[in-house]
Structure formats: C-alpha cells, structure tokens
Amino acid sequence: MTYHAFLIKYAEIGIKGKNRGRFEEQLINQIHIALKRCSGGRPVRALTRAGAKHDANGFTIDRTSGRVFVNCPDEYDYDEVVDALQHVFGIVGICPVHIMPVVPVEELCAAAVRFFGEEYEDRKVTFKVHARRLAKNYPMDSMEVNAEIGAAILEAYPETRVDVHEPQVMLHVEIRERIYLYSHVIPGPGGLPIGSAGKAMLLLSGGIDSPVAGWMCAKRGLRLDAVYFNAPPYTSERALQKVIDLAAIISRWTGPIYLHNINFTDIQLYIYDKCPHDELTIIMRRYMMRIAEAIAGRTECEALITGESLGQVASQTTRSLAVTNAVCTLPVFRPLIAFDKEDIITTSKRIGAYDTSILPYEDCCTIFVAKHPVTKPLLGVIEQHERNLQEQIDALVEKALETDEILVVGQDEQRILKTREQNLQEGM
C-alpha cells in the first residue's frame, strides 16, 4: 500500500480550549524540526489553510479542520519518517494515510475494499467504517458512506463481520478536497510539545535516574538545559563523555541541549576538609543546587529537575530533600519521587539510555561518599556547619561559575559553545 501522508493524533492538546491553537503551532514546529532529518535537505513547509497543495520537493505539514496531516513527497523512507514522528512529544498516534481523488461512491467502495484487503491479510476480523464528509457537496452523507463501504467489504470478504461497539479494525474515510483512507494507528510518545511548558535546568549525572527524570519532564513540554558536576582528576574524561552521550540520547526528543560542565573538585575538597563527613552528601547537594539555580537564572530556566526518588539513598529521605530544597527559590521537579528502581530502569531501557547509564565510570556524587551518611539532617545544624566554609566557599562557587564550559549536544552534534577560558575572560 502506498501512503501519501500521515495523520497526527494528539490528546491533551485537543482540550486546551482557547490555547489549543498555540499548542498546535508548537506541535507543528516540533514536527517541522523532526522532519528536517528525513527530507534530505529538501524544504519542509508548514501550512494552515484548508486544501494546501502538496510540495513535491519535500514534506508539507497541513493543519485543517481540526486535523494535522504530514503530506509526503513522492519518494521518502517510511521507517525513517515514522521513527522521527515517534520522537515528537505531543503526538499520541500516527496514522499512515492513503490519499485519492474525490470519486463517486462506487469507486470509493472499490478503493476501500482494496485498501482493507492490503492492510489486513487475516480477514477474520470485526470492523467498523467511520466516514467524515467534510466536503458538503459530496452526494452522500457520512452515514450513507458508512453503509455503502461496510456492505462492499462484507461482500468482498465474507469472513469479516461488523462490530460497531468494539471493532478490531476501524476504517476511517475522510472526504475533503481529496479522500483520505486510514486504519492503523502507530503509537506516539504522548505528552505535550517541547517548549509549551517553559524551560528547566536538569541536574544530569551519569546514572540511571537523572536522564529518565529529564525525559519525563520534557514529555510534559519542558525544554531542557542541563548541568553536570565534574570532579577531575577524581572523575575521568570517559565519565564526562558518558554524560554527553546521555544528553545526546535525550536530545532525540528535545532537540539540542546546552550542557553546562562545572568543575566541582575544589568545592568538594573544601567541604570534605571543613564539614562532618556524615553530612558530606547533603552539603554537597545543597551547593550543587545553588550553582544549578545560578546557571538557571542566567539561562531563563524556570525550574530545576533532579532524578531523586524517595528513600532510594540517604540523601533522598524526606528530611534530606527538605534540607536540600531550603537553598532553592526555584521550584524543584522530581518526577521519579514515587518510582521504584525497577520502574526507572524499565523507562531507561525504553528510551535507550540504560546501556550508557550503567557504564562503569564514576561521577562526583560517588567519589566522596560517607560510610554512614546522615539520613535525618537538621536544617539548623547543616547551616551551622556550612558556616565553617565561609572563608572560601563563595569564591570557589564563583570560580566554578566563571569557568563553566558550555557544550551543545544533539543527535548529530557535540561541540563546545564556550570554553572555561572564554567564560573566565568574559567575567574579567
């Protein structure tokens, strides 16, 4: 069967009321970006008027009558296009569409029978025809078209039967300026279009949890920047590359991510020297949050995202999280807070991050770990011990921010946008 277009199905966007148009525009923009990878350099046009003509040199995105269609060029890679669309948040279903000219009902019935036969080799199925007559000059209404096509399929394939309540096959027929036939629904990722919910800063480590947390927030429409806390020479270049690779995996859904590589070594060593060792983790986390929030303020991020899960480790008890939160003014999103580890691993595997996450390269969070970390820290006690850091900590934090190395990480690119030296020179 030749598919000339894909119907894009969405769920939540359709109930956004007066804001629906804005969400649709953001969805179309993300589809536009995704299809650029499939167009071989050909243009991708986004059109909103009814009856927009197909551009033979590339893909056309057509929004009309409550539908979004991706019209395809004469030659394209079906699997590549489906894969691209399955990485666009906001899409819940992708329907391959066969398009034909408007013809009399007899010819339409014959075409529908051929379409049904090619789509379903096993004809022992129940089906229902669902017609929409948007072209009001067509001589039959929707119910009459349903009856004619249904009768034709039953006659051609007597092993089938009609079930209007729970059919195994739903054959859709839309009569517009042309006739659209479709049946299969390929699942999309769901969620909301990237950018529709604002922008947030992900604290990205090399573990399993934080990439999943970032992916889940991106699925709800957040555009992501990320910050990684590096601790050379205690962490290796391979640990940094692992985080870059994880950012690249997430970018399949989000587009390019600005990854801030922060040298955290001097801060960690200073905390290790000045503070009780059972409080190392919680105090280090508090300074990570301070630095992440400072970068968020520079980059117009409206929230922080972490991969914390309640009770998973000592720093993720209720009291520990409350003490960590006390240094933040931005909201902190923890989408994994009630997830079991197995749930997180399942999602990590589904998004393709797991094999990279389990590579054996330590990050800064695993280097300076106390044997018996405090699980019920008291905010007043932690703040008192942080006063031991007053002599140098502000200067060390400022140095870490001034030497922030910014990388742009995408599916096809990994490049340094600003080196530590460039940032330092700009701060002088």
List PLM regions with ranges.
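Active-site adenylate/phosphate-handling loop in enzymes that bind or generate adenylated species
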Residues: 148-153, 190-197, 268-269, 273-346, ...
